[in-house]
């Protein structure tokens, strides 16, 4: 009679999208998972995000996608305009149908809180031990354990995942000599949510929100993006422009008149949206140099999401790539049952994921360059190429519709990639 195989135990530090993805994926493979979130509860924080087919196919696999449909903005069009609204540079009609038919998965716009709530519910339903108010005080790399603040509880695992975000304390503990403090990029973001019910006095603006589309305005050192969430009942609007926050300040309440002055002369329709903003915060955009490694030398600690590869938002891949991380890690762990093989799994995980996310981060910087061009010969050449579609031999100025980059981004199947790695490395 064969012996019963005991499941491995994954301890996840951080209840964001990377941590939740890893927890769900690992439970679906039959292993145990404990997820530690230091906040006392999962509050409605954040704003909009864009779920591209590389992540929605994962959410479908995990049994989450259908729970989100009523909360999604499903855009039928993606448009890029000159900042002043004088010219449409690119327009892709039937965006929802194109994404579904080309990638067999949808492109949805979503409020982060709705996505997180659905993933927390799914994780709990699957049996993940989700703990809130659980702050990690220290880690024991020799014993593969974490010690919780306050109670001093020692939580033993077989493998530990640091998914505690850009300002990860776990990263600093694992790699104290790397000098991994995030650095300012020189840009900031105004993040705005406008409710449809508050725009009824302007039928044109209300119609924009009620009929979900994705819209970019591109200008000198700045651009704006707007899309509907929550079934077309809210508009998520983000303004990206040069950073003027004081040193040491990462987030602050913004002055409305200052914000409007920054975008004076832009598309009158965009400015009308800004006239309806009652309060707004501005967030400093941070980045971090590529890390030489994600795995601790012990072989039993690794990282995912912003804790190891924060990326700028110009391709909207931060959340999507974090979910890819979790999917790959969970699938790879599903291929083993002995804790002694975890170092091999983590080595494959790092090899698979690191090269992809580093390329995405570089492509996001390219997108920033192309969307923030000042008026002049380069901008005129960009506009001409975009409007005449004479970009076939190289990457498009807008990677959102680029026939080279879009399939590489959206066609990625994290589960298939992990399965291929298992077959090729004989994990």
From Swiss-Prot:
Belongs to the paxM FAD-dependent monooxygenase family. Disulfide bonds: none annotated. Disruption phenotype: Impairs the production of oosporein and leads to the accumulation of orsellinic acid. Its EC number is 1.-.-.-. Its cofactor is FAD. This is FAD-dependent monooxygenase OpS4. Residues 1-22 form the signal peptide. Glycans are attached at residue 54. The keyword Signal applies. It holds the Pfam family FAD_binding_3. The keyword Oxidoreductase applies.
């Amino acid at each position: 009679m064969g012996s019963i195989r005991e499941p491995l135990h994954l301890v996840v530090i951080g209840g964001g999208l990377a941590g939740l993805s890893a927890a769900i994926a690992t439970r679906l493979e039959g292993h145990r998972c404990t997820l530690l979130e230091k906040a006392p509860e999962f509050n409605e924080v954040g704003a909009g995000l864009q779920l591209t087919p590389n992540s929605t196919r994962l959410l479908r696999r995990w049994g989450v996608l259908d729970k989100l449909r009523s909360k999604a903005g499903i855009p039928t069009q993606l448009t890029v305009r000159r900042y002043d609204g004088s010219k449409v540079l690119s327009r892709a009609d039937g965006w929802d149908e194109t994404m579904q038919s080309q990638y067999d998965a949808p492109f949805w716009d979503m409020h982060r809180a709705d996505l997180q709530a659905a993933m927390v519910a799914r994780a709990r339903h699957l049996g993940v031990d989700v703990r809130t108010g659980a702050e990690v005080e220290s880690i024991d790399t020799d014993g593969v354990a974490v010690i919780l603040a306050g109670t001093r509880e020692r939580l033993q695992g077989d493998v530990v995942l640091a998914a505690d975000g850009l300002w990860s304390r776990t990263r600093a503990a694992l790699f104290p000599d790397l000098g991994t403090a995030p650095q300012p990029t020189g840009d900031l973001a105004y993040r705005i949510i406008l409710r449809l019910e508050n725009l009824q006095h302007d039928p044109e603006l209300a119609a924009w929100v009620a009929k979900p589309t994705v819209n970019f305005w591109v200008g000198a050192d700045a651009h704006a993006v707007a899309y509907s969430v929550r079934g077309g009942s809210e508009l998520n609007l983000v303004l990206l422009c040069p950073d003027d926050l004081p040193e040491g300040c990462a987030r602050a309440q913004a002055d409305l008149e200052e914000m409007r002055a920054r975008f004076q002369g832009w598309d009158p329709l965009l400015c009308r949206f800004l006239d309806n903003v009652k309060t707004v915060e501005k967030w400093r955009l941070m980045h971090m140099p590529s890390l030489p490694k994600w795995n601790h030398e012990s072989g039993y600690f690794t990282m995912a999401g912003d804790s190891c590869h924060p990326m700028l938002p110009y391709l909207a891949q931060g959340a999507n790539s974090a979910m890819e991380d979790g999917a790959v890690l969970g699938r790879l762990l599903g291929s083993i049952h002995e804790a002694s093989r975890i170092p091999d799994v983590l080595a494959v995980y790092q090899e698979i994921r690191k090269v992809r996310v580093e390329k995405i981060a570089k492509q996001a910087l390219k997108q920033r360059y192309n969307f923030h061009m000042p008026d002049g010969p380069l901008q005129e050449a960009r506009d001409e190429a975009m409007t005449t579609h004479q970009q076939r031999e190289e990457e498009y100025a807008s990677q959102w519709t680029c026939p080279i980059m879009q399939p590489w981004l959206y066609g990625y199947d994290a589960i298939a990639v992990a399965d291929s790695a298992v077959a090729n490395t004989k994990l």
